[in-house]
Amino acid sequence: MYCWGSGRIGHGSPLSDIKTPKPLYFNISNSEQVNIFSEEEETEVKGEKDIEFIDFCAGRAHSLAIDNKNRCWVFGENSSAEFGNNSLVYSKVPILNKQFENEKIVSVSCWNQSYAITDQGKVWEWGKSIDTLIPRLLKFQYPIKAIDCSLNNSIGVSHNGIAFIGFNFNNEPKPVDYFIENNIEIQSVACGVNHYLYLTNRGEVYSNGGGISTGHYDEFYNNNNNNNNNNNNNNNNNNNNNNNNNNEIKEKVVEKVVEEEEGEEQFNIIIPKKLKQLRNIIEISSGYYNSLALDGYQNQVYGWGENLNGQLGIEGIDYSTEPILIELPLVEIKHISSGAYHSAFVTNNGELIVMGGGLVVSDDIRMSVALGNGEGGFQTIQFKVDTTKDETIISENIKFNKPTSQLINFEIKDKNENNETKHTNKNKDNHDDDDESDHSDDDHHDDDDNDKDSQGINDKGILTEEEMLEFQYHFNELSHYDGARNQFSPQFIQSLKKNKIVIDKVSCGKFHTLATPSKIQLIAPIESLQQYCIKYISENIINNMETDTSFPDINTLPINTVLKIDSHLTLNRNHSDRSQRLMSYLKSSFKQNINNNNNNNNSTTVNSPKSTKYEWDQYLENYSKEFEANAIVTLNNIEILTKTKGFEISLETINAIINGFIEFSQYIEQTSTQVANSENENENEIEMKMKMKKNEMKMKMKMK
């Protein structure tokens, strides 16, 4: 299991700041040691790192994992009994929860609170939402197969397809009657801070609750405005008035308006409503204020709700009031997860894509902590930093004595060290309602300026004037914005790709992420000619683009190719300012052409509205099938294919290998054997012919 992020994330330190996915070690003897709870030096981490896990979950500040022996491992924060082990002391490394030694745990879920499900469908609960240090057994009417939870919110689904809500804070589970009354079977569930998601066995998605994360925002306000207009304009007709009043009453049963403290209107959907835009959905996930749905037919993801921190992976919008496609045309997605403010996808090839992050507002210097890694990761989570004290404030007024980044050590920094700084996101509100006092930590800044010079640093004079100017430059708002643009877009975790680690499943918490490798290491697929063309064009754009008007021929590319080039540059984090502008221009030009022509043509090129539709298959028709096959083989640098005498490879074979129908190594072995046999047969034939010729010569000599 890999874990990275910030906080108490099981790597042996009281606080960690891990930017690259790092293996966790699991050791049973850790549960017996006392020093693992020490606030002092780091604990030496020993144990197994290749344990197989059947389920795991990253919570708000702690994590749970179930191994293949059905043992429950816990690590992280434990100030609110998150461990369920009759203790309030945290652990720097994973330890076993011995409360379940007599139970066979098969599934877990956690956030502030924790849940464990047994093989019999029994549910154990413990943590912040209840007044107990050890797990308590919940009373469900039916055996439960899955539970999801968020900040002070929980939802479950039984094996027979009944959804349950309202079982946090010592409350008893309540079935959602709407689905029972309408004979709708629920397959899986998810929840955020204020909303619920339900996935049916027919691939449809329902939602209820409050906010734009339900996906019904536009529908609600359109209906509300229409009802008000009808009530104002139909006073002359009693029948119409009655009808309108009935409609209004009906709406109130389904949707309810709530007045917030600021006087703003907010809606709350009482009865679950179907999201009509979504079909063929196979998985759902929810962040605090956003939602995700995986389309099993397209292998693509839809997202809606809040996008202030890039958790939807869509650049240029703060919110989406309805489900919209997160365009990733180069990959096929098989698994999704959404944390508080960031999300992660796993592709069919086992690649991990991560996006988003949390942003905490601070009037002081902002310290950024990466959720990913330097190459293909990003630096988005930001904590408040008190520059007069050697401590970091991370939510709920909790002060940690150990800093988690060299940025807050600048007062005692060695003069010989390089002044490394990090780009951070533009300063925005993150509505971090989960930590009720995240935005009220100003008590620690009253005396910040007492011992500082005009540059903002105390009189120790560690930084030179030049270094200070550079420091200030890297932390101005313009730099924040420029450095953060790519961070709102989905990105590969490059360290996993480089090490050929195939990911099977991922779970996003608040400040950290967990991921497990696949039990079956996939064979790297042969890259198609299309993929090589995409990479070739992308590299040329980055390496040879001197001005914004470079590459005039790119305007003739089909829009699907443009989208794939943009996706390649984005996922691999290769975009430059010019390439981003070029891609934005090409995409907007295509949309403008479509609008100008009123959809009366079939153009799929960027600036050629009258041209015919181009697809990759049509491009390749200009060449023979042998050309495509040879091009793929050559570009993949498969030496054995080009050097083996008599070896032939067809387009059908290439397609079969690419699609996984034929295992490449097996094909090579069989073909090589056939070629070798063929060569042996040829040698035998030649020897026989030579012998025959010799005999003929001898006979002729005798006759003479």
Curated annotation (Swiss-Prot):
Here the disulfide bonds are none
What species is this protein from? Dictyostelium discoideum
- Keyword terms of this UniProt record: Coiled coil, Repeat
Q: Where is this region: Disordered?
A: 221-246, 412-458
Top-rank taxon, per record: Eukaryota
Q: Which Gene3D superfamilies match?
A: Regulator of chromosome condensation 1/beta-lactamase-inhibitor protein II
- For this entry, the protein name equals RCC1 domain-containing protein DDB_G0295713
Q: Where is the composition biased (Basic and acidic residues)?
A: 412-431
The residue ranges flagged as biased composition, category Acidic residues, are 432-451
InterPro entries with a match to the protein in the record: RCC1/BLIP-II, Reg_chr_condens, Ub_ligase/GEF_domain
Coiled-coil spans are 668-698
Q: Where are the RCC1 repeats?
A: 1-48, 69-120, 298-348
Q: List the biased-composition ranges (Low complexity).
A: 222-246
Q: Which Pfam families does UniProt cross-reference here?
A: RCC1, RCC1_2
